[in-house]
Every structure is written in C-alpha cells, then in structure tokens.
Amino acid sequence: MNILDEIVANTRSKLEDKKLKEPLDSLLSKIDMDNLEKSNFKRSLDGKSQSIIAEIKKASPSAGLISKDFDPVAKAEEYESFGASALSILTEEDYFQGNIQYLIDVKTVSNLPILRKDFIVDEYQIFESKLIGADCILLIASILNDDELKLFSELAEKLYLDFIIEVHDKDELLRVKNYSKAIIGVNNRNLKTFEVDIDNSIKLKKEFKESNIFVSESGIKTQKDIDKLKEHNINVFLIGESLMKGDFF
C-alpha cells in the first residue's frame, strides 16, 4: 500500500465515524438548498496574466511539519495582502494536520474564495464542504472511478461549488477532457512516490486542447518556475510549501 492508498483508506474509515456522529440527513438540514451562494472561485482565476492559489497547510507527508507557529487566519491575511487570487486550505487531519475549522475561521476574515483541499471519496464531504463555506473542492482522478467523478462533479455544480479535477498523467487527463466546467489541475508531485517535476504540467498542457482553466500544482518554488510555466501558456499556480515557509518572495 502506497501513501496515497493509505490516506484514502484512513479517510474512508474516519468518514464512517463522522457519519455516525452526524448522519447525512442531519448535515443536509443545515444547508439552505433554496438559497445557495454561487462560487466566484473560477472567476477569480480567469483572464489574468498570473493567478496564484496560495495554500495554507501545517504539514505534509513529504515535508513533515512545515509551520511550527501555525496561524491560518494570519497566513490568509498575508496571502491576501500580497495579491493572491484565491486560497487553498488543507482539511485532512492525520497526514497534513489540517482541520475544517481552519477553513471556517479563514472564511470569516478573508474576501478570497477558498478551495477545500482534501481527499474527497464520498458525497458527504461535498455537502460538508458547502456547509463550512468552501467555494471549490478538489476531485483527485486517481482515487475516483469514472462514475464517481461524474456524480461528484454534478453534485458540486448543483451546490454551486467550483471544482478542480486533479490529474497526474496523460491517461487521467484523457478521462477528464469532456468536463468543460472543471478547473483542470496538474499535480507535479507523484502522489505514489512523492517525486516532483514541474515539467509534468508542461507535458500535459501540450496534450490538453480544451479551454478549461489549467492549474499547475506542487513544486513551484520561485518566480523563475512560474516564468517557465508561463512560456507554455500556464498562468494559474497553486503554491503551498514555499509560501508557508516564506521562501517564495
């Protein structure tokens, strides 16, 4: 079992416990389905020469503890002040030391739209994402089959959530080429080996002829990396570790 399989198995196990504490019907009763707020996450990225989705995360399996004095609200305010277009907040608890409360807290102070960064494997998590104030969710192609991708993306649309479908290779990219409303994210980190190569985004961008917003994720450490990607018509970047450590600017 690789680390991705381990995280997914753990997510499923914890989700069953969560459903016992608060069943789906209870969760749904807290969402006003007749007055759903529309997301502006996608709009915040479109039409700019350079858009940064700035990520808030305390730790990761590859880097270990990233931020010792972790303050998600202060970090969100910092990101907004330097001109980030949107935020990404890790909510996975065991491997990234995230929490949905971080997203809730940031939502109260930040005007930026927020991506809930987690390992979504169940409709429950999508309803929960709407309830806690997320504007966008992440759907990872490698952990979802085609039926799940279709079901989850349709539910996101119904809830007025934008969604990023994350791919890692050409085969996954081919699976999602007809998702015209999706933001396409290319993770430069192999989630099975955790090796990073930003050329992965360049390679897959050449294969992708659709008009979706295209995001390069992971391994972007300098403006030079961004400039290299922009030469290949990639203008949206999700940056986490280097921003959290204060190494980027």
Regions found by a protein language model. Give the residues of each.
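Alpha-helix-loop-beta-strand connector modules within alpha/beta enzyme cores
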Residues: 35-50, 96-119, 141, 150-166, ...
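An N-cap/entry alpha-helix motif that binds or orients negatively charged groups
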Residues: 2-67
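Active-site mouth loops of central-metabolism enzymes
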Residues: 53-71, 112-121, 162-166, 215-220
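Catalytic cores of alpha/beta
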Residues: 121-133, 169-180, 216-239, 248
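Conserved, mostly hydrophobic/aromatic
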Residues: 7, 54, 79, 87, ...
